[in-house]
């Protein structure tokens, strides 16, 4: 998990996104039909279930179901395996989506930097395939 943080300090930090901040590029950039993620559990449902702030994510509805199952079948803690699996799987998919978003942000920052360097070279008169006068014989 810490590999992206190591890359921030050892390599170019300008193209490494900050994991604490929201992405700087629009989510539909390159994906015109991309749907926005929506929360299934409402704020009131999460308050009623007394979920902590760390538990209020896109998988909160699965966690609410799991906690209700554990409460309803208290002595038998093995009765909620299916709900536990659903919640764990949702958390895994959420983690994978966040890592893909992080990687997408990193690649878009690299692309932005490459384009800025290319524009700077063109502005100096060194376009694609051109050689500067000091190099030419």
Curated annotation (Swiss-Prot):
GO BP, sorted A to Z: aerobic respiration; proton motive force-driven mitochondrial ATP synthesis
Keywords: Disulfide bond, Electron transport, Lipoprotein, Membrane, Mitochondrion, Mitochondrion inner membrane, Myristate, Phosphoprotein, Respiratory chain, Transport
Motif Cx9C motif 2, chain ranges: 80-90
Subcellular location: Mitochondrion inner membrane; Mitochondrion intermembrane space
Pfam families in the cross-refs: NDUF_B7
Lipid positions (N-myristoyl glycine): 2
Transmembrane segments: none
MF terms (GO), sorted A to Z: NADH dehydrogenase (ubiquinone) activity
Function: Accessory subunit of the mitochondrial membrane respiratory chain NADH dehydrogenase (Complex I), that is believed not to be involved in catalysis. Complex I functions in the transfer of electrons from NADH to the respiratory chain. The immediate electron acceptor for the enzyme is believed to be ubiquinone.
Record note on domains: Contains two C-X9-C motifs that are predicted to form a helix-coil-helix structure, permitting the formation of intramolecular disulfide bonds.
Family, per entry: Belongs to the complex I NDUFB7 subunit family.
UniProt name for this protein: NADH dehydrogenase [ubiquinone] 1 beta subcomplex subunit 7
Organism ancestry: Eukaryota, Metazoa, Chordata, Craniata, Vertebrata
């Amino acid at each position: 998990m810490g590999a992206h943080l190591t890359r921030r300090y050892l390599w170019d930090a300008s193209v490494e996104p900050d994991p604490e901040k929201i992405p700087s590029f629009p989510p539909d950039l390159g994906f015109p039909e991309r749907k926005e993620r929506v929360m299934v559990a409402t704020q009131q449902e999460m308050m009623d279930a007394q979920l902590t702030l760390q538990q209020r994510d896109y998988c909160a509805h699965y966690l609410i179901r799991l906690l209700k199952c554990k409460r309803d079948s208290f002595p038998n803690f093995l009765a909620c395996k299916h709900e536990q699996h659903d919640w764990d799987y949702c958390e895994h998919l959420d983690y994978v989506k966040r890592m893909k978003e992080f990687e997408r942000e990193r690649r878009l920052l690299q692309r932005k930097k490459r384009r800025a360097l290319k524009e700077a070279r063109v502005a100096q008169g060194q376009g694609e395939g051109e050689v500067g006068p000091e190099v030419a014989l």
